[in-house]
């Protein structure tokens, strides 16, 4: 079975598998085993790309600032740092930049999420690194892209998706746009697209081509994600307004309904045969459930009234194992216990922290469960020596690079730079 092939762990009662922690991934596992990646530390999409590559078996080394801080910096919960090793290097010191170039010289990939021009000013830009490693794939993650009138301005996910038209399209009729967390821009249109670009460029190198720069912009990726909606719009089958279409809460049979206990059910009964099954199980006569658009408001009220007669879980039992396309809306903490996710071990537990398992799954080159997130500077000395960085001892003594050892959860740091 695929789940057993990939994970091979006994499931917990909470729907996850329990595996031991440890910085970095076991060697030689996953389809990207043997691929070396240098990640210049940042937040959001670039670290997510690094996590994806690590989950697939790549050896990922994150370059942290010695005095920097992560959004989540306790050594256990920074899940975007899982499966990576960390080196702490002062990039503002020319000797630190030289150390990063040494790392890049033996790497397959470097990824960074700085504003355009910052990496160049630090001496670790594409030209600096390619001079020693022409096969290097250099991945760049930004919101606006490397060029254009806004390229050098600040921004965040919500602003990037706002100008693409996608944010405008999410929400209910007559209401402001709904904020889809930062999943759509930062991660879907950002880090995921950077990973796709990096993998495509790696394939090119494997076939004898040269390394190259991958310019991944959240505005580009988010726009690309919306290709289907643009196709519907061009075909005259989509109205450029919220809550008026088949898939945006306009249609009452693609909607979320409240149950008697305040829980919710998600309905996606689009196809006629699935819709007929949905009406039967809900107890709504077919003639009452007619789907013509001019009857949508009346139909929505009918369906809402029916759902209010039972609790969320009672309705989930009614629709279980059917083709009605109805599912309970679960919270983040409830999700791991869902029978399908539990059966597939979609969640795992590492060092006591429940988290999503790597995806997708590979029958021939299964990925190992991720190691715990690296502490800042935890692997500085071992990585620099292992990767052949010149003058490692001098760099440690001068504090250009810092080796730190911490007990996870206790945050007791031992600075070994002066050993």
Spell out what each predicted region is.
Residues 1-67, 132, 137-139, 224-419:
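Acyl-CoA thioester-binding alpha/beta core of soluble enzymes
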Residues 25, 52, 56, 106, ...:
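Active-site-adjacent "lid/gating" segments in soluble enzymes
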Residues 38, 79-131:
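A structured beta-alpha segment of the ubiquitous adenosine-cofactor-binding alpha/beta core
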Residues 42, 91, 115-116, 142-143, ...:
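Short glycine-/small-residue-rich Rossmann-like dinucleotide-binding loops
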Residues 46, 96, 118-120, 146, ...:
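Short glycine-rich, flexible loops that bind phosphorylated cofactors or substrates
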Residues 55-87:
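Glycine-rich phosphate-binding loop and adjoining beta1-alpha1-beta2 segment
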Residues 77-81, 154-159, 232-233, 343-346:
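Short, hinge-like loop/turn segments at secondary-structure boundaries
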Residues 78-97, 102, 160-168, 353-367:
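Redox-cofactor-proximal catalytic regions of oxidoreductases
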